[in-house]
Amino acid sequence: PAVIHAPHHGHGVNPCAPAAYDNRPIKEIEAYVEEAMSQTLEAADVLGAETIVLHAGRYEPGADAAARETFAGFLDRHSDPRFALENLPAVYAGYPLLGNTAKDLTALAGETITHFCLDFPHLACTTNYRGLSFTEELERFDALNVTHHHLSNIRRGSITDEHLELDHPEGGLDLNAVVSRLRRHPAVPTTLEYKEDSPEVYARQARVFAGLWEGHARGGRD
């Protein structure tokens, strides 16, 4: 089935802090968000999508509590059982983002959202930024109802998600830990995400992914 990704702050929809980093009048922002989310749900209906991936968004430094409260209000207005809340990197381009770890997502979801999207490079960026163990934070997602995965690569030690290829020469994502999780959850779909909107790039990366999968099955570390 199709998977829908709701518009995020890069598209003008920033659930946890609609006016942050946005010069548009607040009324214009609110009207735009309403229309964009209506179109998102309509697209999911038309395509029969069972999953709508959602970002909590970015916020001004020091406004974490307000961002959490605003996101809760967003869910009150736009709740849908198909929402899958995605973990975001702790920071990007200098601004903080909301919902970085399994613990964060659980708190944000409350009883409203019951599905989650695990983005592996986002988690790696977060653990690099906070000095946490990637494998330990990854294991904490076992307690969540993860219904979708996002996969690409990041540079070694990076805190910035660049959607690099899996076989990038400077790649630093722990692919062995990632593939180990994927093999434990084979029914959960995985989307490969790259900057290049090219069929050739995705076709080659699908082959790279297949090699990682087969290599892990043979007991190799890729």
What are these regions (language model features)?
Residues 1-11, 38-48, 70-80, 106-113, ...:
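Acidic (Asp/Glu)-rich catalytic clusters
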Residues 2-6, 52-54, 83-86, 116-119, ...:
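Hydrophobic faces of well-ordered beta-strands that scaffold small-molecule active sites
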Residues 7-9, 57-59, 88-92, 120-125, ...:
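Active-site beta-loop-alpha junctions enriched in small/polar residues
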Residues 13-115:
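Active-site acidic/histidine proton-transfer and metal-coordination neighborhood
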Residues 15-34, 95-99, 122-187:
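Gly/Pro-rich active-site loop or hairpin
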Residues 54-61, 104-107, 170-180, 200-206:
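A broadly tuned preference for mixed-charge, low-complexity surface segments
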Residues 90, 166-169, 197, 209:
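Short amphipathic alpha-helical "recognition" segments used for binding
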Residues 199-220:
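C-terminal helical cap(s) of enzyme catalytic domains, especially alpha/beta-barrels
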